[in-house]
Amino acid sequence: MDRNIRSTDDVLRLMDGLFARGADRWTADAGSWWDGFYADREKPVPFFVAKPDENLVSYVERGLIAPGRVLDLGCGPGRNAIHLASLGFEVDAVDLSPSALAWAEDRAREAGADVRFHHGDVFELAATEPTLSGPYDLVHDSGCFHHLPPHRRISYLALLDRVLAPGGGFALTCFASGEGGMGSELPDDAFYDREGLRGGLQGGLAYTPESLRRIFSGLTEIELRRMHDEPSDSPLFGEPFLWTALFRRPAAETT
């Protein structure tokens, strides 16, 4: 008989374990699944291109974010981390997949970009690794958040609260609901019935603008829009089935 639950983290880990093993895309145990996903570098996956997100480039060009410390969540093959490093940002990039990180490191060497890559679950790493404890001037997420089950939003918000500097920016790209969008539009509770626990997140969760504003209501919205559709010959990545959002943490109060 186990009676070991005494914290929120214990409850969250218990809920992680309710999902079928093959449905896991977010814990450290999911690294092997993502390794298989990234094994073929020639696979026609839109975000395998070595191009930065168009919205991220736009934020820099418009002065909405400036060089500083960056935490890139779920960096994959590193395209956005490398772009930011090339502009003088000090970048820590985290991913569950050793294969994705090996690809990112290859790209960084080719580009002459200085990025610190970290392997593991960012929720665990940020709590145990002093180098990832923040504060960060920018937390960037292009495609990580929508692979989290609903209960892990608690961990995500706690991470932002812990590592994002006062006045810092939070840049998010995630699946959009509605026409032309992508991802599951099932309500949160549907993922916790028997079928949902067996099937997992169905490729990722779609979000409405209203749900993003509600989830990140502790931050100030700077911009929230559909990602621009970039042509294949563009130097930028852009797919309109994604939301792009920039939020800012309120600056510390002065006395």
List each model region and its residues.
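Class I (Rossmann-like) S-adenosyl-L-methionine-dependent methyltransferase catalytic domain
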Residues: M1-L73, P77-L132, L148-L159, G168-T255
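A conserved beta-strand element that flanks and buttresses the S-adenosyl-L-methionine
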Residues: H140
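Short catalytic micro-motifs in class I SAM-dependent methyltransferases
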Residues: G143-H147
